[in-house]
């Protein structure tokens, strides 16, 4: 009887720990691309309360570094928790609070070697229903496997200014 109880407790604990990084399909991220595709979906929502911030947090190493463009002339470094808090604060913007926010990947380039990966994305971001056109940007993601699961180790971001395009170089043709 004690063994059965221990087994049930262990199974419950294991499923609780692993559920932190399940994609919408209900399976672990088998590829780094699945993780990156899902983070854009995960942060897009009608309001902050409908975002599963715990799920977003589970996508990052605890020590991950997030560097985002926070104004025209400034980038800010965040921890994963700071990144999430910045997003929660953004969702308090009255227009975002009423209409929601959406991000989507326009293009993606991936390099994987064993348990490490680099992914570059060109994305669009918009306040849903806004008269302003969507903003485009570039995210450069580094990932590594941890306990068999892909996790984000770092991301750095740059906004593509209106009317600008990426450099006309082979590395940016994706």
Placement of each model-derived feature along the sequence:
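Short, low-complexity N-terminal intrinsically disordered segments enriched in polar/charged residues
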Residues: 18-58, 172-174
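Sec-dependent N-terminal signal peptides
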Residues: 4-13
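Hydrophobic pocket/interface hotspot
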Residues: 39, 56, 64, 119, ...
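Sec-exported extracytoplasmic/periplasmic mature domains
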Residues: 40-45, 61, 65, 88, ...
């Amino acid at each position: 009887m004690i063994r059965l109880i221990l087994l049930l407790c262990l199974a419950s604990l294991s499923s609780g720990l692993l559920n932190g990084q399940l994609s919408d399909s209900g399976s672990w991220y088998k590829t780094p691309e699945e993780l990156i595709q899902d983070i854009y979906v995960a942060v897009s929502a009608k309001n902050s309360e409908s975002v599963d911030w715990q799920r977003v947090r589970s996508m990052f190493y605890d020590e991950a570094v997030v560097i985002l463009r926070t104004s025209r002339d400034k980038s800010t470094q965040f921890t994963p928790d700071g990144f999430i808090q910045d997003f929660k604060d953004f969702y308090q913007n009255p227009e975002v609070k009423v209409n929601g926010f959406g991000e989507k990947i326009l293009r993606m380039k991936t390099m994987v070697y064993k348990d490490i990966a680099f992914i570059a994305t060109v994305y669009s971001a918009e306040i849903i229903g806004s008269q302003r056109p969507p903003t485009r940007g570039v995210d450069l993601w580094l990932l590594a496997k941890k306990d068999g699961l892909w996790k984000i180790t770092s991301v750095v971001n740059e906004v593509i200014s209106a009317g600008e395009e990426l450099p006309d170089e082979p590395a940016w043709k994706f």
